[in-house]
Amino acid sequence: LIPIALPGPTDMSEFSSESMQPRTPDEARVELASTSIRDAFEGYNAHFRAITQRARRRFEQRDWLGARSDAVERIELYDRCVAAAGARLAAQLEAQSQDKALWARIHARYAELIAGLLDQELYKTFFNTLTRRFFATRGVDAAIEFVALSIAPTDRITHPVARRSYAVAGDLAAVFARVLADYPFAVPYADPQDCARKLAERIGEQLADWEAPPVRGLELMETVFYRERRAYLVGRVYGESRFAPIVIALMHTERGLRVDALITERAQVAVLFGYTRSYFHADLETVGDAVVFLRTLLPHKPVDELYTVLGRAKQGKTERYRHLFAHLARHPEEAFVHADGERGMVMAVFTLPSYPVVFKLIRDRFAYPKTMARAEVEQKYRLVFHHDRVGRLVDAQLFRHLRFARRQFAPALLDELLQGCRETVQTDGEDLVFSHCYIERRLRPLNLYLREVEPARAIAAIVDYGQAIKDLARSNIFPGDLLLKNFGISRAGRAIFYDYDELCFVTECRFRALPTARHEDEELHAGAWYHVDENDVFPEQFPQFLGLSPELREALLEAHGEIFTVGWWLALQEDIRAGALADVPPYPSRLRV
């Protein structure tokens, strides 16, 4: 990791720059602290962009391990910078570091300092993070935090995103050739004319239901988006009276650059920018204007998810909090209830019916046969936060010290939380405070979904469940518990894993064939008659515990029967240990050119 070099402390002058009047010690501390926080954020932001800017070089050099290392470093950067800034502030403020009256003045001065800056919301979130670390705030303290539930962060955006425009008057392939020429890399395209021709063909196919000619213009963001092994050009395609998103996916193969896919379906672009994907590395001059532009492509995508997928995970949490509590203020009579699905052995899971997320609290005691400790569960969630999620792991955001009105909880749920989650749930007057809570997008549990839909959709879901296991395995993730209840189906119909307490690396498992019974007593034994170690996995047993109908079982075995064999897993382990990196395309094969 590169050491963080935050800007040095601002000079603690005795005189006001405006009036040249002597400052009181408190005034000097306010100025010092507020400028120190601003400078600390700008130091963080510069470091964030420096890491992000490496993505182009990683792509050009096919340095996929380096790209993965950058992704982890950038995720960890925020907390490292906050810790460094907090230590500096504690030294600057000394005994007054816990003085809320002083912090209220720091808050006011900080607001003045950032008033004319772009991406003010990022500055504000950084400030809030620091005050919450100093005071362990339960809920929100408006005197020392920036709170504006009714104002969206994008309301103030006036800085348009930089983009390139292309008018289409005739030869569409020539326009795409110009597009590729406008986005050069240190390595050439293997066959740019062929790529342009294929793009023209595919866009004609995908927009065949538009009026002729379907394409009148293109508009692409200047910034290239990078993630894993691909680079993306993102923008809009215009017809006579409509527009659609357009994403051109580029790959760097051993033979050079080539176009891998063209995506104009809004649903597939939403998946690309979704909550099951790792974060993009896109060097944006300002983030808010990019979010505004992306919202024109994906109007139903929550703002918090767009900030998050752009790598601004802390801002994503801020926006999720803002939107959630604005929703609660509009629906004060609606109650939190148990989430649909089987009761969790490790987590208490609840939801608000009108809001598309679930809340997960770790139980004080886990039901048999779960044996792990609370710290192990938290570690699993941290692992997912840092790992490549390959579109199959839901992004679980950790919130601390959340405060809710006690009256908004259904009686049965309230009783369960107070009795079974005492380490996490505290009562404070008429409120409940959750010291540790994961919030995730709500999915329909797969076991329920299969009972509710027609056979064709059930078959598609169970086949995608098998594909999800393969995608995770190739990224070195073994779910641990393959039961259908631990997977959910997204609105796009994708199978997503969301129960992480038994998740582990594929390379940590010992995949074994089931021993053959040596005599009748062993064959008739009620339990396992053979020794089973903690990390032993028997793939042949998987289908026995899924509870599938004969039709669904047959469909799963036909499509993905190899995942129920020891040989497939052992071969995969060898590949992973040899350094093979999985490439899981974030779009269906039908969109590839």
Where on the chain are the PLM-derived regions?
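Noncatalytic N-terminal accessory/assembly modules of large enzymes
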Residues: E14-A267
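Extreme N-terminal basic, low-complexity initiation segments
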Residues: I2-I4
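Conserved ATP-binding subdomain of kinase catalytic cores across diverse folds
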Residues: Q206-E452, D464, R474
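Conserved kinase catalytic-core helix
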Residues: P455-K485
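Active-site-adjacent segment of 2-oxoglutarate/Fe(II) JmjC oxygenases
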Residues: K380-L398, R510-L548
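Long, compositionally biased intrinsically disordered regions
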Residues: Q193-A200, G204, F538-V593
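Catalytic activation segment of kinase domains across protein kinase-like and atypical kinase folds
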Residues: F478, L483-W529
